Amino acid sequence: MKKNIIITLLAAATLTSCGEYNKLLKSTDYEYKYEAAKNYFAKGQYNRSATLLNELITILKGTDKAEESLYMLGMSYYNQKDYQTAAQTFITYFNTYPRGTFTELARFHAGKALFLDTPEPRLDQSSTYQAIQQLQMFMEYFPNSTKKQEAQDMIFALQDKLVLKELYSARLYYNLGNYLGNNYESCVITAQNALKDYPYTDYREELSILVLRARHEMAIYSVEDKK
């Protein structure tokens, strides 16, 4: 115990010097490195904590420090806004430690990291589906979590992003009209599918109006074709 306290104090002192940090990187005293990584993490120096922990997770595997080091590595990436790497680290954590100390938080932050990394609605939404999946899994595993409502709110926001992408597509089809085909029909199909998949969306009214307008245009052209 006394030895651990001394190592922790020495690690904390090391943080004051950039030169000492470079020496620390070359050190083979892994317990010392681990305590230094924890101190860097506590001080918000996440780049340094991630660098050290990335080396240590393999070395510490099978020890009582392995679990905490992997979770801390994920949070170090998360706090640097490297959300993809953070999510993968959290996923590795809860797959390795399904009943671990930080499993609830790891599952939550895996979903939230992917949520924060999703693109704007006009772009490919593969990562949005992945974020929804992770957040839904979090809620299934931890239905009584204090973070359940936040997870649910993120899912609703992600679903709205998917609806918005469909709304943009439906608008485009409507504006194209009969150019190179019956785009009004494509507008109706796209809008109706969005309404079917997400019946409680905030964009329900706009999608419904697009369906009515597109059908109206289809009816007009149908009458003209029969003349």
State each model region's role.
Residues T8-T14:
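Bacterial N-terminal signal peptides
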Residues K2-I6, S17-K227:
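Acidic, polar-rich low-complexity tracts and alpha-helical solenoid repeat scaffolds
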